[in-house]
Amino acid sequence: MEETEKKIATQEGRLFSKMKVFLLSLTCACLTKSLSGVYMNSMLTQIERQFDISTSVAGLINGSFEIGNLFFIVFVSYFGTKLHRPVVIGIGCVIMGLGCLLMSLPHFFMGRYEYETTISPTGNLSSNSFLCMENRTQTLKPTQDPAECVKEMKSLMWICVMVGNIIRGIGETPIVPLGISYIEDFAKSENSPLYIGILEMGKVAGPIFGLLLGSYCAQIYVDIGSVNTDDLTITPSDTRWVGAWWIGFLVCAGVNILTSIPFFFLPKALPKKGQQENVAVTKDGKVEKYGGQAREENLGITKDFLTFMKRLFCNPIYMLFILTSVLQVNGFINKFTFLPKYLEQQYGKSTAEAIFLIGVYSLPPICLGYLIGGFIMKKFKITVKKAAYLAFCLSVFEYLLFLCHFMLTCDNAAVAGLTTSYKGVQHQLHVESKVLADCNTRCSCSTNTWDPVCGDNGVAYMSACLAGCKKFVGTGTNMVFQDCSCIQSLGNSSAVLGLCKKGPECANRLQYFLILTIIISFIYSLTAIPGYMVFLRCVKSEEKSLGVGLHTFCIRVFAGIPAPVYFGALIDRTCLHWGTLKCGQRGACRMYDINSFRHIYLGLPIALRGSSYLPAFFILILMRKFQFPGDIDSSATDHTEMMLGEKESEHTDVHGSPQVENDGELKTKL
């Protein structure tokens, strides 16, 4: 007898170790998948400039990840539970790695990146068309050489990036639904909040590394190793700069493939941790499952797929939770996807600086909030109803704080002919005829070229020619233009490359913006675990995997795919000046009206998230009519199926189960 008990204890220790290995492996998988996703998001502006595409097309590339996920999520979530879940997750990690590898390939098949400029890299006087020269006979126009126009077709290689992102989405499909269902099936229910909190921490730790990687790659010129960077006339803060986006995708490919290895050595199933009655020891010392665990597995095989779908669609709390999530995620995706671009345009930061600030100020508090939220749920054994009220109140408070972002804004950069007149007076935007003035009408300047210079008077000009500059000294980024007729500043009339920097007042507002971001991110993450536990507890155990998959499917269809596209299209409408390709085609946007940009970037998420509190409020009302076994008896937390309590003596399952007379029968039914 003692020998049998020792075997049981030894086997339970092994099972516990395997659960920890699975949890660690799944956390690493969540980390690498989120690393890849956030890195992709951080490089969106670089890809937009590399291929000279609009923000809406860049949003389509970003949303293509959801397209790949879309076609497989529901079927993987349902049928994946019948397969070897750890192995399926491992295969998904390999596919993600291959997708990242494909996304980096266009760099190796394209020529060197040629940014829009009229300045010769060596400052050769024979090609000084960037200066103001009176009586110039040749007007600067886009090149119409057919050979060069064909060369521009390389920009269509963004499709390869999109296909790679679709493949990455396919590989990501099984990780979350199968991973969470595996934990829910084989771990104590009271430990689930902590385990999910650890997973969420991994999901946020991944973006931290992804943003740091993105910040590093954004500082490296895209053609590093094949060009002399000393000859460049642009810096990382220039809107024409393209960082080495392809390097990060190679890193993501490697870590995703390495993460897949442990999953191929994990078992298909584990006995429910802590439930000895579900474990039997045979004569040869092996552990076998019986009872509830076996019945649940058989039930999952025999149940009809459409029956589960019908139950989920008839679950009011589940459907309202999906509606709330879709509205919330629409606002969150729109805000996070274009946050680097917003920091660039609003506060004058380079892409590398913007990505670094996001990683330092936004993600660590989110990571901490996820962990604390899961710990609080486990430590204080918060019931499902209390968790719902907690999540709702914290979310509303965070939403009100988000409104303060409207007060932390900067003015448009002073660019003569776009945002201000040549005399420094602000005028109506989008006026094309204001580009030329009396000081440069005889210079025969191109009005489309974007080669900005900053004058000593604090006003930027679209090019040295439009500033009326006739001389220059230096080479590369150290060039200084002199004798500029449009610049009048205490007798000095020189200019340097690039837009003028924002003032100290704008820098102070950025600091307040970042501090507010820390507070908002922490509160937002605190609501995630309580809210997610409400979601998990409102469906039966055999429906959880499909429920998670359907929830993810709806978010993909109604938020993940359309949100970046329509949001990017709205941002495109705020563009003040578009880049010009060799054949005269429109390239990427070089400068935005930051006032209109701000109204869209902040206003649309506020409207979407504000509307999400209506279905969330109905969830709180409906939860009063439902009874959770855990709200009555804490020992019933392992059986947290939700029951409708219309009468004290009569309990009906939310999915339409027959009546049960006592808690013991309830456990048997479930």
Swiss-Prot record:
GO function term, MF aspect, one: bile acid transmembrane transporter activity
Stretches in topological domain Extracellular: 41-59, 112-155, 225-242, 334-353, 406-513, 572-605
InterPro entries: Kazal_dom, Kazal_dom_sf, MFS_dom, MFS_trans_sf, OATP
Xref: Pfam families: Kazal_2, OATP
Keyword annotations of the record: Cell membrane, Disulfide bond, Glycoprotein, Ion transport, Membrane, Phosphoprotein, Transmembrane, Transmembrane helix, Transport
Broad class of the protein's primary localization: membrane
Topological domains, Cytoplasmic: 1-20, 81-86, 185-203, 268-311, 378-381, 537-545, 624-670
A Gene Ontology term for the protein's cellular component: membrane
Entry PTM: Glycosylated.
Functional pH dependence: Optimum pH is 6.5 with estrone 3-sulfate, taurocholate, prostaglandin E2 and L-thyroxine T4 as substrates.
One GO BP: bile acid and bile salt transport
Subcellular location: Basolateral cell membrane
Record has Iron-sulfur as a keyword: no
Site (Essential for pH-sensitivity of estrone 3-sulfate transport): 107
Domain called Kazal-like: residue spans: 433-488
Biased composition (Basic and acidic residues): 645-654
Catalytic reaction equation(s): estrone 3-sulfate(out) + hydrogencarbonate(in) = estrone 3-sulfate(in) + hydrogencarbonate(out); taurocholate(out) + hydrogencarbonate(in) = taurocholate(in) + hydrogencarbonate(out); L-thyroxine(out) = L-thyroxine(in); prostaglandin E2(out) = prostaglandin E2(in)
Post-translational modification Phosphoserine, affected residues: 634-635
Transmembrane parts of this sequence: 21-40, 60-80, 87-111, 156-184, 204-224, 243-267, 312-333, 354-377, 382-405, 514-536, 546-571, 606-623
Glycosylation site list: 124, 135, 492
UniProt topology in membrane: Multi-pass membrane protein
UniProt keyword Transmembrane, yes or no: yes
Top-level lineage group: Eukaryota
Role of this protein: Mediates the Na(+)-independent transport of organic anions such as steroid sulfate conjugates (dehydroepiandrosterone sulfate (DHEAS), 17-beta-glucuronosyl estradiol, estrone-3-sulfate), conjugated (taurocholate) and unconjugated (cholate) bile acids, prostaglandin E2 (PGE2) and L-thyroxine T4. Also capable of transporting sulfobromophthalein (BSP), ouabain and gadoxetate. Hydrogencarbonate/HCO3(-) acts as the probable counteranion that exchanges for organic anions.
Homology family: Belongs to the organo anion transporter (TC 2.A.60) family.
Name of the featured protein: Solute carrier organic anion transporter family member 1A1
The organism of origin for this protein: Rattus norvegicus (Rat)
Gene (UniProt): Slco1a1
